[in-house]
Amino acid sequence: MSRIGRQPISVPTGVEISLDGPKVTIKGPKGSLSHTVAEPIEVVREDGQLIVNRPNDERRSRALHGLTRTLVSNMVVGVTAGYSKTLEIVGVGYRVQARGSDLEFALGYSHPVPVKAPDGIRFEVQTPTRFVVHGIDKQQVGEVAAKIRGLRKPDPYKGKGVRYQGEVVRRKVGKTGK
């Protein structure tokens, strides 16, 4: 039995859960998320907790057991607390500006780079070189943060670019002069 999959998911007060066949919908103070559970796996409610079960020990069932439990657990955390990812911009003249609900980056290109906020995502600019991506869907928050980081990845020689807060960039030694 999967170590992760066998753990029950505790449901805090103020969170509504509806189990409609393979579809799990979770509503909380921050919003609503739904997920369709893969075929052999089933989600059951017992004593104010959610239990993820698998019918057999086939390879696919074992793989999906822990995955499904983690996805449903992330949904519960998302609708109660939410998720956020902080990014930093390093480099002379590199900065970010809020334009309504969207962001506009100056990243050393000849033009500003606009980034629109997808549904369910909110941006917060703390300083011109630091901003936060907020949302209730962990996967979507990470994906948007990764796309923004990909606009100008950290340079291995000078370290310039967009990076996650606390990310350590491996630096390379430049070539030596004559």
Curated annotation (Swiss-Prot):
Any one GO cellular component localisation term in the record: cytosolic large ribosomal subunit
InterPro entries in the record: Ribosomal_uL6-like, Ribosomal_uL6-like_a/b-dom_sf, Ribosomal_uL6_a/b-dom, Ribosomal_uL6_bac-type, Ribosomal_uL6_CS
Keywords (A to Z) from UniProt: Ribonucleoprotein, Ribosomal protein, RNA-binding, rRNA-binding
Keyword Ribonucleoprotein among UniProt keywords: yes
Molecular function as annotated in GO: rRNA binding; structural constituent of ribosome
Keyword RNA-binding: yes
BP term (GO), one: cytoplasmic translation
Superkingdom in the source lineage: Bacteria
Subunit structure comment from the entry: Part of the 50S ribosomal subunit.
General function of this protein: This protein binds to the 23S rRNA, and is important in its secondary structure. It is located near the subunit interface in the base of the L7/L12 stalk, and near the tRNA binding site of the peptidyltransferase center.
Family (UniProt): Belongs to the universal ribosomal protein uL6 family.
Entry protein name: Large ribosomal subunit protein uL6
Organism listed in the record: Parafrankia sp. (strain EAN1pec)
Gene label: rplF
